[in-house]
Each structure stands twice: as C-alpha cells, then as structure tokens.
Swiss-Prot record:
Organism per entry: Caenorhabditis elegans
Subcellular location: Cytoplasm; Nucleus
Keyword Cytoplasm: yes
Function: Required for extension of lifespan by sir-2.1. Required to modulate lifespan, in concert with hcf-1, acting redundantly with 14-3-3-like protein par-5. Promotes nuclear export of yap-1. Negatively regulates the transcriptional activity of daf-16 by sequestering it to the cytoplasm.
Protein name: 14-3-3-like protein 2
Gene: ftt-2
GO biological process, one term: protein localization
Subunit structure: Interacts with daf-16. Interacts with sir-2.1. Interacts with hcf-1.
Keyword Transcription regulation: no
Length: 248
C-alpha cells in the first residue's frame, strides 16, 4: 500500500530534523506527485529539501572546479578532478531536472493564488540558473534563456499582485538580481533591480505583515548586502552573493 500524504509529510519533517535532505526531498516529491495543490507548509518543505540537496552539489562543484584549475601541470590529478567534477555535475543536473519536471507537470499548473504561482516560477528560474552555472555553449544559452523567462514571468505577476514588502516578492527580486550579476554578467541591471526592490519595500514599510516581518526584513538586509558588495571595489570573483534559502 502506498504511503498517505500525512505520513509522507511527517516523514519529510523527521528527515529535516535529522538533516537527511535527500530523504526529505524523496518524501516531498511523492507528496507532489499525488497531484493536489500543496499547502504553504508542504510547499516550503519541498523547497527547503531540494534547496539543500542541490546546494550540497553546487558547493562541491565549486570546490572541485577550483581544485581542477589549480592542478594545471599535473595531468593525472587534473584528469581525476575533471572526472569527479563531471560526476557531481550529473547529480546536480538530475536533481534540477527532477524539480523542473515537478514544477511543469504538477506545481505550476495547479497553482491557484498569485503567491503560489510566483513562488513556483521563481523556483523554476532558480533551478534553470543552477543548470546555467555548470553548463556551456548552446546548452548554457538555452537554460539561461529559460531561467530569465521564468523569473520575468514571476516578476510581472509579483509587481501586479503582491505588496513590495511581501517576502516572496522580495526573495524573487533578490534571486533575479543575482541571476543578472552572476549569470548574465550585468552588474548595472543587478544593482538597479535590487535597489528598486529595496526602495519600494522601504517606501511601504507600513504594509509589512506581522507574520512575515522577520522574513521580509531579512531579505531586505540581503538585498542591501549584495548592493554593497556589488558596488564596492572589493568585490572579487570568489565572493558569493546572497540568495534566498528555501521556504521564502
């Protein structure tokens, strides 16, 4: 007999407490495949699970890529690093493809409220962005375009339907600006987008919802930190910008 939804959700929560994010993601994937629209709690569990699963591979990929570049001159070591990087890349691509399939097949079509639609389109932009980080050539052009389209669609809905202080709208602006800075190498556009989102939120601080006050102000701080980083001469290639974690 297949597990019920409640049991799967409880198993995901247990896995989260044990920091076993692969198990957490597997449970939430099954919940999603049951086909019903996810509650806010379920949506956040899914997001946190996959953010951690993919985050571990993104981090590994960066470390191995750096080692690979530093082993020039030692062909054997460089080949070993290259093969290991390709192994991690395959894992990362498979995870991203998993999430994108869930988004296209279940989550985006079932999203009723604007908030849910923006959340999932932002997520789609994020996972195409992660693919862009490890892609090259025509492959990269394709995933970059899909990432930008997803972010832009989410951004248009958010501007029309959500308060500038809403944490999901702010989180979208944060990640979309990181996309411009890191993927498109467009620092001016990244700064403009981040500054506009920050200024719009500041202008409407009185609309801050008590429940999301902490989330909203945290993301505003991250926007400001990125702006400081991006506009300073100290910004270096190996300094990572802030982006939202799962659950925002």
């Amino acid at each position: 007999m297949s597990d019920g939804k409640e049991e799967l959700v409880n198993r995901a929560k247990l896995a989260e407490q044990a920091e076993r994010y692969d198990d957490m993601a597997a449970s939430m994937k099954k919940v999603t495949e049951l086909g019903a629209e996810l509650s806010n709690e379920e949506r956040n569990l899914l997001s946190v699970a996959y953010k951690n699963v993919v985050g571990a591979r993104r981090s590994s990929w960066r470390v191995i890529s750096s080692i690979e570049q530093k082993t020039e001159g030692s062909e054997k070591k460089q080949q070993m690093a290259k093969e290991y990087r390709e192994k991690v890349e395959k894992e990362l691509r498979d995870i991203c493809q998993d999430v994108l399939n869930l988004l296209d097949k279940f989550l985006i079509p079932k999203a009723g409220a604007a908030e849910s639609k923006v959340f999932y389109l932002k997520m789609k932009g994020d996972y195409y962005r992660y693919l862009a980080e490890v892609a090259s050539g025509d492959d990269r052009n394709s995933v970059v375009e899909k990432s930008q389209q997803s972010y832009q669609e989410a951004f248009d809905i958010a501007k029309d339907k959500m308060q500038p202080t809403h944490p999901i709208r702010l989180g979208l602006a944060l990640n979309f600006s990181v996309f411009f800075y890191e993927i498109l190498n467009a620092p001016d556009k990244a700064c403009q987008l981040a500054k506009q989102a920050f200024d719009d939120a500041i202008a409407e601080l009185d609309t801050l919802n008590e429940d999301s006050y902490k989330d909203s102000t945290l993301i505003m701080q991250l926007l400001r930190d990125n702006l400081t980083l991006w506009t300073s001469d100290a910004a270096t290639d190996d300094t990572d910008a802030n982006e939202t974690e799962g659950g925002n």
